C-alpha cells in the first residue's frame, strides 16, 4: 500500500464515491485526484467539486463529455445495430470506455500510481473499467474498494460518512429502492424489488418515459437525415450527436417509447434483472436498420447481422479498447459509406413505425425490376428456372439417396 502515492478516483460526488475518497486517504495515506464526467446523467456535477474540496482534494477534474460520448461511442455502436442478447441497447456498457480512457489519461498527466472506481465486486462495471484502463495504461494499478473493505451495506456507508464528517444528502430510509445509472443514452434500474423477476415495477419507477397507455393520443411524425450511417439532422434541423440524443429522448419519452424489462447474463457469471428506458436509442435502431435495408447489399447486411452479436458481446464485456473490437469497427464503418438518406417515422403509444425511407444517392431499390406490373423486360422470369434447379440440385441428390436406402 505504501507504494501508492497518488490515485485518480472516478468520482460522482454521491455517497459511495465520497466514502471511497476518504477511505483511500485513510487506507493508503495517498493523495486523491477526482475525476467527474458529465455524460448526460441529468445531475448537476458542479457540487462534486465542493464536496471534493471539503475532503481535501487539490486536483479536481470535472469534464463535459456529452458530445464526445455520443460522437465517438454511441454513434459508432449504432452503426452496427447493436443489441446484447437481442434486446439490450448497452446504455451502461458503452459509457464505460470513455470514463476508463479519461481515468488513464488523467493518471498519466498527474503522475498517479493508481486509479480507483466505485463498481462493486459482483457486477460488470468493475470488469469494464479495469479492462479499459489496463488496455490504455498497462502498468497502472487499480484499486476497487468494494472488493477490499467491510462496508457492505448502505447503513455502514452512512455510518462511516457520519463518523468522518462526509457531507451526505440522502439520509437513512430516504432513497429510491433501486440502483440507477443514467447518461444521454439511457437510464437503468436494478436491485430492490426487481431482484424478484416476477415483480412488475410500479409506474412511479420509470423516470423518463410516459407509459404507452398514458402517452400522447396524437402520433408524431419525424424525419431523420443520415450521412455515412449517422444521424445529422432531425426534421431538417442539423444537430450535433448529443443534441440528436436529447431531441429524440424528448420525443420518444412523450410517446412511451423505449421501456425494457429483461434478465441478462452478466459477464461475471450470474443472471441479473434490469429495467431500462432508452427512447432515443430505440428510435435510432429502428431508423438505421430501415435505411440500411435500402442502401446496403444483401450479403453485406447479412454479414453485419452475423457479426453484430460478437460486437455487442465485446462492448458488454468491456473490450471496447481491444484489437478485435477495433477491427470489427473498421469493417462496420466501411459498410456505412453508402448509408445516406432520410427515414420517416411515426411515433405512437410505445411504437416506432417506419413509414418511409429514401436515398437519392445510394438506394439499391430498383422499382423497374421489383414492380408487380409490366417491367418492360427488365427482369426475365424465365431465368429463375435455371437458378432454382441449380440450387435444388443438392436437395434432390439427398432425396434420391434416401429413396434408394
Curated annotation (Swiss-Prot):
GO terms for cellular component: cytoplasm. Keywords: Amino-acid biosynthesis, Arginine biosynthesis, ATP-binding, Cytoplasm, Ligase, Nucleotide-binding. L-aspartate binds at residues 120, 124-125. Pathway: Amino-acid biosynthesis; L-arginine biosynthesis; L-arginine from L-ornithine and carbamoyl phosphate: step 2/3. The keyword Ion transport does not apply. GO terms for molecular function: argininosuccinate synthase activity; ATP binding. Belongs to the argininosuccinate synthase family. Type 1 subfamily. NCBIfam families: argG (TIGR00032), PRK00509.1 (NF001770). Homotetramer. This is Argininosuccinate synthase. It comes from Nitrosococcus oceani (strain ATCC 19707 / BCRC 17464 / JCM 30415 / NCIMB 11848 / C-107). The gene is argG.
